[in-house]
Design a protein with these regions (language model features):
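Short helix-capping/linker segments at secondary-structure and domain boundaries
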Residues: 107, 123-126, 170-176
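A short glycine-threonine-serine/GTX helix/turn-capping micro-motif
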Residues: 148-158
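S-adenosyl-L-methionine-dependent methyltransferase catalytic core, i.e., the SAM/SAH-binding region
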Residues: 129
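Conserved non-catalytic scaffold segment of RNase H-like nuclease domains
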Residues: 1-110, 125, 133-140, 148-150
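Generic detector of well-ordered alpha-helical packing
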Residues: 8-10, 97, 115, 156, ...
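Conserved beta-strand -> loop -> alpha-helix junction used to position metal-binding or nucleic-acid-contacting
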Residues: 108-120
């Protein structure tokens, strides 16, 4: 079975402005194995607008690239092709689910696997269920860094790969 792990980075909520995605990253998992050759990402043009001070990520470094990035409508056919027809995996999938529903309210995506909810249920009592902390706890950080050299947390591709590796770990236990 093929799964798709994804992550959006968004502008965050700013009064008078919608929360918009500015980066999408994804990677496929087949039969429990993460397929690095399927990594895909895009920056998304959001126009000249403020970002929430609470929005984390590399957007400040990428202002020029974001200004030249395609609008989501330009890459939407490719996004749909990459996401439809596979179960979707995200860490705290509410953000990804909300973004996709907002962008295409008549399109059904999923089913969804939430690695955050899964980890909370399977491993009660951990000090933190943040993606980075879980990746560290399960000894996956080096593998994430090999897949996404020069990247770090709150980069959509890095986070999607981290989520995929975490999901793969859960699948290898025979419990996901």
């Amino acid at each position: 079975m093929v799964w798709t792990a994804l992550d959006f980075e968004t502008t965050g909520t700013v009064k008078g402005w919608p929360n918009e995605p500015w980066q999408l990253g994804l990677v496929k998992i087949e039969d429990g194995v993460v397929l690095p050759e399927t990594k895909w990402e895009t920056l998304l043009h959001v126009g000249d607008r403020p970002f929430s001070p609470r929005a984390v990520g590399r957007y400040a470094e990428l202002r020029e690239e974001l200004a030249a990035a395609p609008a989501i409508t330009d890459v939407w056919p490719e996004i749909v092709q990459r996401l439809c027809g596979t179960p979707l995996i995200a860490h705290n999938c509410a953000t990804e689910r909300t973004m996709l529903t907002k962008l295409a309210p008549m399109t059904v995506f999923g089913p969804w696997i939430d690695t955050l909810a899964y980890a909370r249920g399977r491993y009660p009592g951990l000090p933190s269920y943040a993606l980075g902390d879980l990746v560290e706890s399960f000894g996956l950080k080096d593998e994430v860094e090999r897949m996404c050299p020069g990247r770090t947390w709150h980069d959509a591709l890095y986070d999607a790969c981290a989520c995929a590796l975490l999901a793969s770990r859960f699948m290898s236990e025979g419990v996901a």
